[in-house]
Amino acid sequence: MAAYGLKLPLVENMSEQSSQSERDEFREYCQRWLDENRPPPTNVPLPQNAYEVTYHEHRTYLCDWQAKCHEAQLIGTDVAKEYGGHGHTEFQAIASAEVRKARVPYFINWIGLGMTAPTLLVHGTEEQKRRFLPPIFTAEEIWCQGFSEPGAGSDLVSLQTSAVKDGDNWIINGSKVWTSLGAISSWMLLLARNDKDDKYNGITYFLADMAHEGVT
């Protein structure tokens, strides 16, 4: 199997518990790939972090870069293949460390990668994992965070956005602020209160479609 012209011979025969030599080989692969595939600068300089991404050019550039890194097996490295990953046990930490050291552009879908994906892998249904994980890794669908509120800030115990069950659906009412990546996202990690009498346990975690009617 080749990844952008670099051979990765250990991919097909990697053991479940990798040896030190396999880890070293993968680390060297990551270093070579990042060195040879470092993207050229954008015409419009990138902001310091993904919070500040506003230009369409920035989004396209960063989504293309993340997709390329995923194809090279630097993202979703240890996630099962049926969920859009590469199935290499214990290797994601190596890939992430080499990406940081290489000082290449950041991954725009950091909320999807750092919050949505880990949550789905532990708590998601099989259908949810197959539906949502692949486009998180490739940056085809960007995720934002819907936690903080105008009257509560980041104090989730004071969260007021309500969620009321209506048959098979939920009716959600409320407002969110400091919605990181909200302007460019397809989906939101949304916290809403389904039990107003239970401040600590009466909160539900929703996967909210940003294109849904009523989202403004």
Model-derived regions, located:
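A short, Trp-centered hydrophobic/proline-enriched beta-strand micro-motif
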Residues: 139-147
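Long, well-ordered alpha-helical segments
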Residues: 30-40, 94, 124-129, 167-173, ...
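A short core secondary-structure module
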Residues: 168-169, 173-216
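Short, solvent-exposed loop/turn elements at beta->coil junctions and helix N-caps
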Residues: 82, 148-152, 177-178
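Hydrophobic, small-residue-rich alpha-helical packing segments that form membrane-like cores
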Residues: 152-155, 170
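Amphipathic, small/basic residue-rich leader segments at the start of a protein or domain
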Residues: 2-110, 131-138
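A structural signal for short hydrophobic beta-strand segments in well-ordered beta-sheet cores
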Residues: 161-164
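N-terminal glycine-rich flavin-associated loop
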Residues: 108-127, 153
